[in-house]
């Protein structure tokens, strides 16, 4: 709740409407957390505070479209509004500070599903970015693209931590451990891009908030990469068949061989010869 926006405007409407209906109409106070990441929900709150009766569950999305049009023009406003809506829906499930490898389960396909949702949303956001007028790039990164990429990355990182814990073979264990390390590094690169490159560093230090390494509600002093296990055993690629038909590429032998591999010969990966 400190690092990125995790507020759904639908929730803002529901709570403010309760206030209004129960007679709290003179003064509304909101703890914004941090102004910069919360620009859109703050805008919604202020607009609703000005005219509470103008908002209802069926026209909230229209407000998001209007906001997107004001920032990026009419052409892509509806698509951007839908991306913003889905971002806040996904982000609201759990704050990035409290996300960890045990947040979602594998038994109900939860982890792969939520990671896939974030991956698809990032692709949508990138496609729109490429269509925009360059004068809107900075604003789009601040309001739309960076939050999605940052959340997608942290979700994939903790998913990789979970896969590392679940893995049994040395190859899988080390693959997922390396994946965690790369994603942890990418988190710092994304934040550095926001701080130093977007708008020529106008918002330097805005993304310095610690968001990885929480063990309880209070924030740690510094970022700490999630723990992973590693294997020192010699690792080999294992080919598993699930359809009853067993085959491997000619060059994927493991031992007891005197063959020479010829890359790219044949229909698939390679061929072998005894010469």
Where are these regions (language model features)?
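Generic recognition of flexible, low-complexity loop/linker segments
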Residues: 14-18, 143-146, 235-237
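The substrate-binding groove and active-site-proximal loops of carbohydrate-active enzymes
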Residues: 1-10, 50-54, 69-73, 105-112
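Extracytoplasmic
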Residues: 216-275
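Short, flexible loop/turn elements at secondary-structure junctions
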Residues: 33-36, 71, 88, 252
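Acidic, His- and aromatic-enriched active-site or binding-groove loops in soluble protein domains
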Residues: 47-63
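Catalytic-core regions of glycoside hydrolase
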Residues: 1-52, 157, 200
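C-terminal non-catalytic alpha-helical accessory regions
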Residues: 60-214
């Amino acid at each position: 709740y400190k690092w990125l926006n995790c507020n759904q405007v639908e929730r803002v409407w529901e709570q403010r409407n309760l206030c209004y209906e129960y007679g709290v109409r003179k003064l509304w106070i909101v703890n914004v957390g941090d102004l910069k990441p919360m620009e859109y929900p703050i805008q919604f709150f202020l607009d609703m505070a000005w005219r509470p009766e103008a908002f209802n569950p069926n026209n909230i999305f229209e407000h998001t479209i209007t906001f997107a049009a004001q920032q990026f023009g009419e052409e892509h406003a509806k698509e951007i509004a839908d991306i913003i809506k889905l971002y806040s829906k996904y982000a609201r499930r759990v704050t990035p500070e409290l996300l960890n490898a045990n947040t979602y389960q594998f038994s109900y396909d939860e982890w792969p599903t939520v990671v896939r949702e974030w991956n698809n949303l990032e692709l949508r956001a990138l496609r729109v970015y490429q269509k925009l007028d360059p004068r809107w790039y900075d604003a789009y990164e601040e309001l739309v693209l960076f939050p999605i990429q940052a959340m997608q990355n942290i979700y994939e990182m903790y998913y990789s931590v979970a896969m590392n814990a679940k893995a049994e073979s040395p190859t899988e264990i080390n693959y997922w451990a390396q994946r965690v390390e790369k994603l942890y590094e990418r988190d710092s690169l994304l934040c550095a891009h926001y701080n130093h490159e977007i708008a020529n560093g106008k918002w330097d230090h805005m993304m310095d908030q610690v968001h990885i390494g929480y063990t309880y509600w209070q924030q740690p002093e510094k970022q700490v990469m999630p723990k992973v296990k590693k294997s020192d055993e010699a690792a080999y690629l294992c080919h598993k068949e699930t359809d009853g038909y067993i085959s491997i590429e000619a060059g994927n032998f493991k031992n007891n061989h005197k063959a020479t591999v010829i890359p790219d010969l044949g229909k698939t990966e390679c061929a072998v010869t005894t010469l």
